[in-house]
Amino acid sequence: MPHIVTIGEALVEVMRTELDRPLNRPAPLVGPYPSGAPAIFCSAAARLGASTGFVGTVGQDPFGDCITSRLTDDGVDIMGVRERQDLLTGIAFVAYASDGSRSFCFHMAQAAASQVDWEQIPDGYLDDVRYLHIMGSALSASQSMRQACYRAARHVSANGGTVTLDPNLRPELLPPDQIRAVCQPILDVAGIVLPSGEELTALTGTATPEAGAEHLLANGIDLVALKRGAEGCTLYTAQESVSIDAYQVQEIDPTGAGDCFDAALIVALGEGWSLATAGLFANAVGGLATTERGPMEGAPFRDAVLAFMADQGRPLPGTEDR
């Protein structure tokens, strides 16, 4: 059985090819690309050498094939993936603005992507999981998926695994003022939280990300990994905080970079690396993820990450430093 599992939406993504072209007007699009934050996470972790499994639902259509083929090619276990004949695979349309922001239009609530439930998880699949990664987008898609995530989190925690949470706030799916209530059952059993600054303050009701990290640590979270985009990341524990600068890359498509960061950090921590080394590695993976068009296309293999880090003059420390 896989060591790292995630539950959630599987989508294809179709995106604008030009900046500042809103989705309510005709303009060129490109795609489909396999996507969905939990699926991106699994693909990235598998490419880094981890044993991963994905639980989700696709339609029996070409878009569903696009997703499952990519996951299988990357080595992700898809025993928990269900195909529906009566529903189409979910779709996310994405537009980019020149200020770096994105807007989404999802076909998910009435699509296969949202139809995930506890019963489709194979018996025993979660018993020996080391990390269960939950995304806020999965908690926002449907009641059945939300309840499956809650139940899985309790199960993994009770069996000695670590539950990790990326709030992954999407206002198109969940109003920001509901994020705390929806995420709280996961926070009750989570060990690691991986938010952006905006997500961290929304999640905790604090004025600053730093205060938000302190709040989570005081309430039982072991590690808060604050993703700061082009500025890198800051990792908070009760004992220390470590800030790590980002690697410089030529960004093409930022979608999925945070999911790839999550995957790299969890893979590294699972291998026993130090906090600073894990954060350095995760920054490199997150940066490389932005250098190709398509949310999974830039997810690098481990050898490529190590070569990139060395070429940038910030190599991964030797095993004696981990």
Which residues does each predicted region cover?
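Hydrophobic anchor at the start of a short beta-strand
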Residues: 51-52, 78, 163, 224, ...
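Conserved N-terminal subdomain of the carbohydrate kinase-like
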Residues: 51-136, 306-322
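Conserved beta-alpha-beta core of the PfkB/ribokinase-like small-molecule kinase fold
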Residues: 131-214, 231-233
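Short, conserved phosphate/pyrophosphate- and ester-handling motifs at nucleotide-, phospho-/glycolipid
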Residues: 45, 196, 258
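Conserved phosphate-binding/catalytic region of the ribokinase-like
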Residues: 1-5, 154-155, 205-322
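General beta-strand structural signal in soluble alpha/beta enzymes
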Residues: 6-7, 80, 164-165, 194-195, ...
